[in-house]
Amino acid sequence: IGYYMIKKLLADGNRVSVLDIETQNLEILKNKYNSNFIFYKVDLRNNEEVKMAVDKTAKEFGIIDIAVHNACKCTFKSEIETDFDTYKDVFDVNYFGALRFVKSIIPYMTAKKKGKVIFTSSGVGVTGFMNISPYSSTKGALEALAKCLRIEYAKDNITFHIMHPPLTQTKS
């Protein structure tokens, strides 16, 4: 989902910064859209890496007006077979990674009194689904987070949105 979102944004003339743990496919886009595209190899579980990449993006582009959190991790096991460490790991990427990202970008948006944050979620965060309890739980938590942040930052003209893409075949 993310790669094609990036391609479309760049093709439409937007400046794009990407924080991703896997960057090999991004080199192709960098060669084509050099001045409008930067990327950083970042593990969203690492506060310092996230903050450093966001700070560099703001310095390079001068503004962060739209931010999309699209990272996710999903495991496929029954709930009884899923240990707590798996839950913690999936939450650390999907939910706490989103929170780290927001905490890094929000100062730039509040300074400009403008911004839009989009979280990629899933219908299973609302309905639930078998054999992906950690993933579904994180998406439900993201839904609640977006609602809370939408209220808290309305005064700063910063909006928070949830995107529910259709079922896709992706590596997560």
Regions found by a protein language model. Give the residues of each.
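Canonical Rossmann dinucleotide-binding motif of NAD(H)/NADP(H)-dependent dehydrogenases/reductases
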Residues: 1-16
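Active-site-adjacent segment of SDR/Rossmann-fold oxidoreductases
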Residues: 12, 127, 148-159
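The beta1-alpha1 cofactor-binding region of Rossmann-like NAD(H)/NADP(H)-dependent oxidoreductases
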Residues: 42-52, 84
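Substrate-binding pocket helix/loop in short-chain dehydrogenase/reductase
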Residues: 78-79, 83-91
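Active-site loop immediately N-terminal to the catalytic Tyr-X3-Lys motif
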Residues: 80, 129-133
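Active-site helix of classical SDR
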Residues: 102, 138
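Residue(s) in the substrate-gating loop at a strand-loop-helix junction
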Residues: 122
